[in-house]
Amino acid sequence: WVTDITYIATDEGWLYLAGIKDLFNGELVGYALDTRMTQQLVMQALFRAVAAKRPGKGLLHHSDRGSQYCSQAYQKLLRQFGMQVSMSRKGNCWDNAPMESCWGSLKTELVHHRRFASREQAKREITEYIEIFYNRIRKQARLGHLSPAAFSQHYYAMQMAA
């Protein structure tokens, strides 16, 4: 998994979005939105990802070196979930390119075409983008031009047939 935080402008001020992407199928497996960029924000995204996917021990979790990800509480949580910690080299955004690409898609396809009057409006539209469009409909070249949901369905059908 890779993770990062981005921010979205609203008429009420910034809204922060922490997301976790599964590199296997390109799905955003967990995310959280809040008015502040805190360790609680990234922990909420992690709890949601773990609750949704129940990963096995040893899953590789990659982030940048932001204070939220380096916090003792977050690192402890990763250990409790049995995850292997990987962090970007200092000042090297290329290490987390898949997550940066995800944020670029979100902003190009949704955020830059909207003016959010409120944080609640932004939360609703971002949630719909992730849950309906990004994970279920949006095709990714890396996945053979399938959506994350279709790729997973195809993969597991092939596993059952083998």
Feature roles, as predicted:
Residues 1-162:
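Charged DNA-binding/catalytic regions of mobile-element recombinases
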